[in-house]
A protein has these predicted regions:
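Positively charged n-region of N-terminal signal peptides that target proteins for export
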Residues: 1-7
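Non-catalytic cap/lid and distal C-terminal segments of serine-dependent acyl enzymes
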Residues: 21-276
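Bacterial N-terminal signal peptides
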Residues: 7-16
Length: 276
């Protein structure tokens, strides 16, 4: 009899644990700046209905990707929503927007992510509606985007991250549609200089923004990430900097995103987040 009871208790416990699963939805958002609907994946913890206001991590995709990349190519990462009691939002950032606002009215992704999307999420979900409850990160183009948007909108985001980010665009003038967005570097050097992350460190003061940067040693963006790390050190800007063996690929990002979300959770868990 005791053996049967033990087996029953084990089964109940197992079912209770395995029944917890983050809720993954695809929603339509609207950008007034670009006059179009844009899809986003919204991940909520299993107990969202009974929970209070919770923090949000905005997780950006890379060049040629879309809103579904993280869910499809990093299976299991969404469990962090349950583990850390947070929401994760994966917006569509266009094929090659680099998350800039440009002269092209169809590429206003800085406005979309930092203003329109944040407003949409705050209006539809139980979120902490200030920078203490918002973080942003991403991979490659999205790593650039995470830092670019957070550096420029420190009133919106309290923490920022980058995985394999293109944090200095200038060495790559002919790659990844950047010239389509900014014009040719040879003819528009000033625009390029003003829109590369490494030239925006002057916007930071120590302890105003929590920052984590991660890049594999075999990544073609490793050199520019090293340079950004040195610039942050020179300016005494606290940040976490992770270098591991690895290249510019999904096996690396599947691992890296776990560290990013842990870092963001630690930021959210502070009694008082840094304020500008």
């Amino acid at each position: 009899m005791n053996k049967v009871l033990l087996q029953l208790l084990f089964l109940i416990t197992f079912l209770a644990i395995t029944s917890q699963a983050a809720v993954v939805d695809t929603v339509d958002t609207y950008s007034a700046a670009m006059k179009k609907n844009i899809k986003a994946v919204v991940i909520r913890p299993d107990n969202y209905a009974s929970a209070g206001e919770m923090p949000v991590v905005y997780l950006l995709h890379g060049y040629s990707g879309n809103y579904a990349d993280w869910v499809k190519r990093a299976p299991g990462f969404e469990k962090a929503a349950d583990t850390f009691q947070m929401m994760i939002v994966c917006p569509d950032g266009g094929f090659g927007s680099w998350y800039w606002d440009t002269k092209d009215p169809q590429f206003q992704y800085e406005t979309y992510v930092s203003k329109e999307l944040v407003s949409f999420i705050d209006s539809k979900y139980k979120t902490i509606k200030d920078r203490r409850g918002r973080a942003i990160t991403g991979l490659s183009m999205g790593g650039h985007g995470g830092l670019y948007l957070a550096f420029r909108h420190q009133d919106v985001f309290g923490a920022a991250g980058s995985m394999s980010g293109g944090v200095d665009i200038r060495p790559f003038p002919n790659n990844w549609d950047m010239a389509k967005r900014l014009g040719k570097y040879s003819e528009n050097a000033k625009v390029w200089e003003e829109n590369t992350v490494i030239n925006m460190v002057h916007l930071l003061t120590p302890n105003t923004l929590s920052i984590i940067i991660d890049c594999g040693k075999e990544d073609f963006f490793f050199g520019v990430n090293e340079n950004l790390h040195r610039e942050l050190m020179y300016r005494n800007i606290p940040h976490d900097y992770i270098v591991r063996p690895g290249a510019h690929n999904w096996p690396y990002w599947n691992n890296a995103v776990q560290y990013q979300l842990l870092f963001m959770n630690n930021f959210f868990s502070r009694k008082e987040a840094p304020v500008k």
